[in-house]
Amino acid sequence: MKTGIGLVKGQRKKEKTWTVSVEHGPKELRGVSIAVRGPVIVGRNPGADIVIGAGYVSGRHARFSLMGQNLFIEDLGSRNGTMVNGRPVMEPTALSNNDVVTVGDVAIRVRYA
């Protein structure tokens, strides 16, 4: 008899992940989607994880971060602010599936699936 580990088809649940997708903004970024597995910096600075060379975006504008299974957005002292569903972000803010985060004039859709 052999010893080993096997999976029975359909028994393992797919783990949910948070993704952020650019919906409105520079043409070259529209449709870009990334899975959030750690802190994600959004800004104009080339060292950012999502680099947006558009007006109204600061060098280090905002940060997506995970706390357990929850995703948060935090404004990093940007000049033009960050919004969630049209409301200004004043402190780290918990996000929900399908929320829209606005950084400058760029809209980023958040999904949990």
Q: What residue spans do the PLM features occupy?
A:
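Intrinsically disordered, low-complexity acidic Ser/Thr-rich regulatory segments
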Residues: 1-53, 65, 102
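Residue "hotspots" at secondary-structure boundaries inside conserved domains
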Residues: 32-34, 55, 74, 87, ...
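Amphipathic hydrophobic-ligand
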Residues: 57-59
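Short, conserved beta-turn/loop elements at beta-strand boundaries and strand-helix junctions
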Residues: 67-70
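Short, basic/aromatic beta-hairpin or loop at an interaction surface
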Residues: 72-82
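C-terminal boundary/linker segments immediately following FHA domains
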Residues: 83-113
